[in-house]
Amino acid sequence: EARVNGIEAGSFSETTTMKGKAKFQIGGTDGVTDEAVMAAYFWEVDLNTSFTGEDNLNVEIETGNTPDTDSFLAVTDFGKGSGDVLKVSDLNYTFPVGGWSITVGDSLDASKQFTGACSYGNTVDALSDCGTGNSIAVGGDQSISAGYDLDNGFSFGVGLSAEDGEKSKGMFTKEGEDIYALNAAYSADNYAFAIAYANVDVASYWGINASYSPDGFPTISGGYEFGDPDTGKDTTQFAVGLSSDLGPGEVTIGMGTNGAITDGDEELYAYDLSYTYKFNDGMSFTPFAFIVEGANGGDDTTGVGAEI
């Protein structure tokens, strides 16, 4: 076939699709040292190719300038920092085996095929996944994740991941840092719940989250996670949230612990409020505000901003 600049016509599958997103966030805080207004962006393109109609090869490419630490962007659940450099952030392949859907890949969460029940869209990063980010939404690197849907509301998942698979420590060795996780969930018309167990080499976590959407009332979501580290005291964390249609958009309010709290330590909480308005199918505008309590009687961090 004809070639243009070294690329052969037809070299891409006719079933390859591309979608992308660009996000911008601006805001500032009060009550901490850095009180200047800050802004950041995140861009991602997602390529999906099917060879059989039932499988999918996924390649994600992204860039952004979100710093690892500062008083505002470190609090919000926004994008990733890559120093304005394009990089492959995810490469995985999904295929069916019997009734199972199996995903294998690099930079892949062990929970990729897990089913969660939290429907609250948080602003503060610590409130993500209704506080179950170490169990129901456990991360990973070189991973295999499998899910099975019984078609009656129940689903199950299992995940294995090696954090050092590309290093000399190897995968699933005594020296490596590995993840083993299990998940079960049930979904009905107006409620859902999910549980998960994850062993992340240095600790074990149990998590549960749920949501309920009563007719004519806001959707209620909540989650709780218990951590049992190999050394040290146990940890707990939780988050709850409400979301509801309001005018042309959706309002969301939530609160929870500011990350995991070690038994006997000071309990610190975070609160957030946001409103999302969709201009069209591809663009939305979300103003938000949050409060994160300060440790040891220090000043709380209060922030306001917007994302588009």
Which functions belong to the PLM regions below?
Residues 1-112, 116-165, 174-189, 196-308:
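Beta-barrel outer-membrane channel/assembly domains of diderm bacteria
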